[in-house]
Every structure is written in structure tokens, then in C-alpha cells.
Amino acid sequence: LGLDLVCFMQVRLQAHSEKALARFEETVRSLPAVLECHYLTGEFDYLLKTVFRNRQELEHFDRRILSPLPHVVQVLTSVVLSEIKSTTELPLPGDSA
């Protein structure tokens, strides 16, 4: 598919009302570049796992789509250099670590 640029984008919102959060989440659900979206505790409100074909697509997404969304005040992007582990297996009770 050519979507080799994987990024994690941490997003901080200015407003945290139920309406602001719902609006952000609804928008993110509609964005094909976003594979995962997690609501967090801590310094940032959301963590997005995103994929792009190249740096130009990433820049367009950041500057023209994500950052201009209402209430978004900060986006911190980390580019994945290599994937160390990816699994869908869940630890079962009684399994040793």
C-alpha cells in the first residue's frame, strides 16, 4: 500500500467539555490516516497512531487537517523508526510473564 511512514501523534486540547471531546473524537473517527485513537491521562489528551505515504502527507495532515481542528492547541509527532513488537495476543490468567 505504500503507507510506510508510521507516526504517533500526541494531541492536547484547550477545552475539555463533553461537547469539545465528542467533536474531536467524531472528527478523528472519519480520518483514514488515523489507525488508532486513545484518550489519555497526563500531559496530552489523545494519542493517535497514524500512517502516511511520505513526509509531505504527514505535513499536510498535521498543518491542514489535525492542528486546525477546534480546541487543538498542541500536536507532538513522533516518527516510528522501527517496530520492536506488535501482537494481538493477550496474556491469559496463569500464563507466566
Language model feature labels by segment:
Residues 1-97:
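A compositional/biophysical signature of low hydrophobicity enriched in polar/charged and small residues
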